[in-house]
Amino acid sequence: MKRLIIFDMDGTLYSLNAVLPAVYEIQIDFLNLKKGWSREKIEAYFNDNCVFPFVSEKSRSATALFQSEGLDAKEWNDFREARFPFDAVVPSPTVSKELMDDFDKLGSCVLVTSNSRKNAQRILDKIGINVASFDSIVCDDTTSFNRPFCKKDIFEKLLCDYSMRPHQSFSIGDRYSTDIKPLLELGGNGVLVAAPESLSGVVGDMSNGKLMTCDAYRYFPSEGITSESLWG
């Protein structure tokens, strides 16, 4: 059976624990520069919009938030690229080319991230994953969609581009609202991972047709889809 497997990057392919506090400061600095808001106002605004300095499955994209404020996407990408804490990006010992090859055997693999292409490339290099591991990569500065950055729109186009029915698609990510819910709304499947180390269990269970909710990940099946139609 054909499958479309869509990966998030930050928090999914590598841990954000050491990266997120520094990225949060970059986001504060950018909004202070563009809006002139105080730190207290920015922190309250971020909290109201689920942009946090810590890992949370409720987190949402600061990039999409900035674009909804009318801030220039390229200016934000340039600002972030110049300050991103690449030294804090730590590869997971279980996320490897071999792991991605195992996913590739199950279907077409696509990376969707609100990072710029340059940032995404540097992060993938740091964690030892080749861009060739993905059939395509969609970044904030490579998508032609209207702003703000919207994963649901991107997922819908990917289903069309790869000639997939929704139940043949799987979104794998660490944030429910941003990575999982948009594809569920289109009729697809979601796999919410607890950490990058969860991916080895996901690919094993997908290979055996036994995705489930467990300590490592939570599986959100396409509504009304049977195991026979998913794995037959």
Where are the model-predicted features located?
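Acidic, Mg2+-coordinating phosphoryl-transfer loop and its flanking beta/alpha structural elements
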Residues: 172-209
